[in-house]
Amino acid sequence: MFVRFGLILFCSVLPLVLSGQEPPRVKPTESIPAEIPAPEVSVKQIGEHQYRLGEIEFDSKTRELRFPVTVNMREGGPIEYLLVHENGKVHESILTTVVSPLHLQIAMKLLRYKAGHGDVFNRFLRPEAIEKEGGKETERGETVAFTFQADDKETLPIYELVIDGESAETMTPGGWIYTGSTVEGGSFMAEAEGSIIAIYLDHLAMFNMTREGADIDERWGARHTVIPEIGTKGVITIRLAEKEVTKKP
């Protein structure tokens, strides 16, 4: 089982793991995926359908992934990320992790998650350019949901950690897709920049919001009433969510 899932499938998806999606806070342009040497990784089977890659545990049946995170910010804003690597843009993120974004990308591909930005970055285009240069909603990556659990406390949908500055209310449910980052100059950019779950649209991040306001960098803040103390350890779970049709901004 390990050989079939951990090696054969890994070899089949590795070229996809390292292929880019597109570029950022302006409409991305087309790029040719860079050729990158395969990283040395070790996928270990720890259960009937459960595997471990570094600090990431994932389930080939449910397609869920879990890995450790740390509370980095609990009040104030603006914030541009829900999660970054501990060497990433920590001054703009609620959570940090020691997990390698490249390992996370590999795990996502082993679980056959589809990546793509679709029409998410169209809002950075002039209206007259959307038909020619814009992406389509059908080209989006798969819709995902995140939950956060600190120590042995209640598990929360991750959007509950965020406050919408426009309404002064908790962020509403839903709104993230797997965009998959990109490769530039031979580097997997989520690994280079440490950007994992973006709130403010970022083509270098692995996950981006589809909701209205994702292109406004000062709209979102940390919700201190539910976020535990800075330094608190926790776990993020990623799972497939129901695909939603997002109202165009």
What do the PLM-derived regions correspond to, one by one?
Residues 6-17:
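Bacterial N-terminal signal peptides
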